[in-house]
Amino acid sequence: MRSLHIWCYLSKCVILICLVSRLKTIARLFWTVSQPRLGSTHKDKQHLAWGKAFRTQVYPIGIEPDEIVRQASGPLPPKLAQLKAELKNVQNIFSVERLDYSKGLPERFQAYEALLEHYPQHHGKIRYTQIAPTSREEVQAYQDIRHQLETEAGRINGKYGQLGWTPLYYLNQYFDRKLLMKIFRYSDVGLVTPLRDGMNLVAKEFVAAQDPANPGVLVLSQFAGAANELTSALIVNPYDRDEVAGALNQALTMPLTERISRHAEMLETIVKNDIDNWQATFISDLKAVTPRRSQCQLPDNISSCSKLA
């Protein structure tokens, strides 16, 4: 933020808000970069800058775990039931993200290739399915990512595939949410490794969709906001292909007792911080804020904002 010429303009705009919320890391980052140059003061979560009082608090958004369980449970559609039967002896790594450069899909493919390279004992016994529906198809950069993934999927399958075994399935299409929850439930590993993500609710949905008696394992990027809450996931650096590959191997070989323990810890957090709690807590705190007597005005321009060296 400090590298932006308009840093102080943005800071002033944010400070006009009475209650600033999001993730703990973002709240801390905002104050770290703003405080030295704003001439502002703060005590605990209460702050004062340019004569305006405001508060920072952390409200990580949640999901509806009960609804996820309902969608994930019950009989499978005929085609999915048939697929599950065909793959009963195969461990499934599953991932679903919109086609976006921030999701780290090329890096994810490279990490899976590293798994096949360093842990050949899994050959013929695992399958990685990546669903990535098209996003902003008219933008050239997104077209390039799509073509890159198609090329990488073909190359990896050509290098490691066998008769009767295709190691990587890449699907560039939309799937119904209810169907995805059912796929989550029978997946052995959920791979969620964005390069940067404010929260990533897919990680929480994967955990909520699992069978508590035989849950899958979540491999999660340290740069996803959800990693602050889901600390019992296997947390990885998505830029380190070998680290992600090692985590995938750990997930595929993890004993049932450890899987149950990790899942229970994450599910407890998800249920405690569900969408209803998120909404109620934020609204309650917002109502507790004392209204300002004077109307807040946005800065007219950024001419007073000095450039940073």
In which residue ranges do the predicted regions lie?
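Catalytic cores of carbohydrate-active enzymes across secretory and cytosolic contexts
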Residues: M1-A309
